[in-house]
């Protein structure tokens, strides 16, 4: 069992040995709790610490040393906060910086080395005062990227996981969408589907982590849809 019943929209990240689950909601309450569990032993999660804010629908991502939570929604507003923790050391999350846009329900992803936001944020499920929602993200090496959001955002942002600081501009998606899906490899991040917002779209576009710039067309989904896992 988790330390706290956060049935609605918590987000998780981890290392090779430890998994972390943070935030979430059990209506009407929002939580900041970070749960910790080790992969090699069965049993209940233990209290790791707390996020800086009680919230849900964040993006979560990390490398082998750090875990990060970005964006999300509190009981009163969408936020652009990025928190981080050191996975090996329990404690309260520390400020990393801010997203360029306020977003909830981002996507995230990372490889086994270092990736940002997101083991890819869900809903799709990966950024500031504009109240963006449902971005997607991916990461490789020490870079994590985020894209999309409410208001049909086409903005792609990135951060460097090993340091701290605000997210910066990476480029633009080929189409502005809400609630796309995100995935990636060690070379590319791919964004699929979403809502524009009058209708779902079937667009798939991609960027390469090492080459900042606008996304390029990859192809199309078999059906137009949003909130892909």
Where are these regions (language model features)?
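Polar, enzyme-active/binding microenvironments
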Residues: 1-229
């Amino acid at each position: 069992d988790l330390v706290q019943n956060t049935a609605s929209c918590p987000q998780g990240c981890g290392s090779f040995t430890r998994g972390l689950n943070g935030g979430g909601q059990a209506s009407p309450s929002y939580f900041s709790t970070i749960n910790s569990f080790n992969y090699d032993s069965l049993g209940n999660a233990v209290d790791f610490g707390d996020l800086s804010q009680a919230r849900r629908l964040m993006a979560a991502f990390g490398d082998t040393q750090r875990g990060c939570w970005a964006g999300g929604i509190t009981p009163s507003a969408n936020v652009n906060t990025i928190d981080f923790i050191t996975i090996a050391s329990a404690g309260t999350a520390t400020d990393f910086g801010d997203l360029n846009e306020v977003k909830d329900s981002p996507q995230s992803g990372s490889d086994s080395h270092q990736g940002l936001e997101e083991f890819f944020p869900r809903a799709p499920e990966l950024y500031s005062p504009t109240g963006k929602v449902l971005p997607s993200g991916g990461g490789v090496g020490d870079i994590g990227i985020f894209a999309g959001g409410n208001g049909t955002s086409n903005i792609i942002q990135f951060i460097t996981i090993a340091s701290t600081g605000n997210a910066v501009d990476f480029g633009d998606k080929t189409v502005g969408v809400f609630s796309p899906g995100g995935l990636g490899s060690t070379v590319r991040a791919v964004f699929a589907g979403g809502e524009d917002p009058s209708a779902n779209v079937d667009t798939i576009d991609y960027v390469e982590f090492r080459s900042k710039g606008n996304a390029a067309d990859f192809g199309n989904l078999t059906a137009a849809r949003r909130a892909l896992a």
